[in-house]
Amino acid sequence: MSAQSSSTANIFVVLRQLRSLCYSNRPVTTSLSYTASHRTQSTTSTNAIKTQWHSSASYSTAPPSKPEKRPVEDIDLSQPMKSKPKKPQPAWAVQKNALKAKFKEGWKPRKKVSPDTMESIRKLHSMDSVKYSTKNLAEEFKISPEAIRRILKSKWRATEAEEIDRRDRWEKRKIRIQEQMMELGLRHSDPVSEARPGLQEELSRGTSVWNATEKTAGGYLPQKSNREFFPKKRFGAEERSAQDGDPWDVSGRDDLIDTKRDSFGDNWPQNSHMRRGAQSRTQTEDYHRQGYRGKPNW
């Protein structure tokens, strides 16, 4: 009976030591285990218990280590390497690769050559076939040598009616492009004014004065040269006779009786200011309508 009680006490001691190793907190001992541990001596040594605990599997929180890569020298090139499966290409990528394989030089559309250019190529080649060879003409006109050969070999020529029709179409095309540019504000209208047909001559006369001034030393105009650009007022016979006499003498002239006389308004009819203002407005509108190209270089 005593041997059985001693073995039981030894088991309790071992369990208590294992528990103390597993948990950091001090375990609560009971009166039975306390009495048994103090009354009986342990038969299992403490070093044996520690050795048994350390030999058990331990848990590590560190990430798993990556496998070491094999050096390049150890790789056997004779064995086929496993390649990753490629993703299926979309339809547009397949078509793009096919076009690249077919047209290695890229997108080079044919250059359209006008009939005048073809005629120039024929004339140059007929003048000097060595200087204007097929290769030189191809480099000059930026087209392929095969196109130059076809142009030189072709015997087709346009008739006179076809040539006239083609030139008319080109003229209409030029006018249409100019009208479109004028609508977009990229080109100004013709400087010739329909209201005053003689205005172009006056502007050209003013421009010639400026050109003559630029050639002189210093490039300065005379004092009253800027008045030459504007048309002078033409006086009638009555107005000319009124200017010859005394401006303050109103006897015998009925047109100045009811008018306000001053140093500027004398010798003018009653409605002369209105007519002169209308004329200046018309002239200003013409200058604005012509654009900057039709104006004299003031």
Curated annotation (Swiss-Prot):
Localisation per UniProt entry: Mitochondrion
KW Protease (keyword) present: no
A family per Pfam: Neugrin
Signal peptide: none
Biased composition (Polar residues): 35-63, 205-214
GO cellular component, one term: mitochondrion
InterPro entries: NGRN/Rrg9
Residue ranges, compositional bias (Basic and acidic residues): 225-243, 251-264
Keyword annotations: Mitochondrion, Transit peptide
Targeting presequence: 1-41
Region of interest (Disordered), ranges: 35-92, 186-298
Entry similarity comment: Belongs to the RRG9 family.
Record's function text: Required for respiratory activity and maintenance and expression of the mitochondrial genome.
Protein name: Required for respiratory growth protein 9, mitochondrial
Species this chain originates from: Arthroderma otae (strain ATCC MYA-4605 / CBS 113480)
Originating gene: RRG9
